Amino acid sequence: MARVTVQDAVEKIGNRFDLVLVAARRARQMQVGGKDPLVPEENDKTTVIALREIEEGLINNQILDVRERQEQQEQEAAELQAVTAIAEGRR
């Protein structure tokens, strides 16, 4: 299954080198970042799940960039809110 997935995923991304980068980035998000898979896990490793997500058009480099920017903005807003709450508590 992985071989077919790789061929289909290459068609979605454009070339195998970019595919490796996008799949590794997404797999790392799931493995280290605690992100949930967008497809059923089916007892697959994160790299295979990432390839399946790419194959289905759920993930590409632009989507990953947008999601990371949104998460960063949310984190910055939460940090600002926490700092504001601390500053107001000291008054």
Swiss-Prot record:
Keywords: DNA-directed RNA polymerase, Nucleotidyltransferase, Transcription, Transferase
Enzyme class name: transferase
Its EC number(s): 2.7.7.6
Keyword Transmembrane helix listed: no
Listed SMART domains: RNA_pol_Rpb6 (SM01409)
InterPro entries hit by this protein: DNA-dir_RNA_pol_omega, Pol_omega/Rpo6/RPB6, RPB6/omega-like_sf
GO cellular component: cytosol; cytosolic DNA-directed RNA polymerase complex; RNA polymerase complex; transcription elongation factor complex
Keyword Transcription (UniProt): yes
Top-rank taxon: Bacteria
Gene Ontology molecular function: bacterial-type RNA polymerase core enzyme binding; DNA binding; DNA-directed RNA polymerase activity
Catalytic function, reaction form: RNA(n) + a ribonucleoside 5'-triphosphate = RNA(n+1) + diphosphate
GO BP terms: bacterial-type flagellum assembly; bacterial-type flagellum-dependent cell motility; cell motility; cellular response to cell envelope stress; DNA-templated transcription initiation; intracellular iron ion homeostasis; nitrate assimilation; protein-containing complex assembly
Protein task: Promotes RNA polymerase (RNAP) assembly. Latches the N- and C-terminal regions of the beta' subunit thereby facilitating its interaction with the beta and alpha subunits. Part of the processive rRNA transcription and antitermination complex (rrnTAC). The complex forms an RNA-chaperone ring around the RNA exit tunnel of RNAP. It supports rapid transcription and antitermination of rRNA operons, cotranscriptional rRNA folding, and annealing of distal rRNA regions to allow correct ribosome biogenesis.
Oligomeric form and interacting partners: The RNAP catalytic core consists of 2 alpha, 1 beta, 1 beta' and 1 omega subunit. When a sigma factor is associated with the core the holoenzyme is formed, which can initiate transcription. The rRNA transcription and antitermination complex (rrnTAC) consists of RNAP, NusA, NusB, NusE (rpsJ), NusG, SubB, ribosomal protein S4, DNA and precursor rRNA; S4 is more flexible than other subunits.
HAMAP family given in the database record: RNApol_bact_RpoZ
Family: Belongs to the RNA polymerase subunit omega family.
Database matches in PANTHER family: DNA-DIRECTED RNA POLYMERASE SUBUNIT OMEGA
The name this protein goes by in its record: DNA-directed RNA polymerase subunit omega
Taxonomic source organism: Escherichia coli (strain K12)
Upper lineage: Bacteria, Pseudomonadati, Pseudomonadota, Gammaproteobacteria, Enterobacterales
Protein's gene: rpoZ
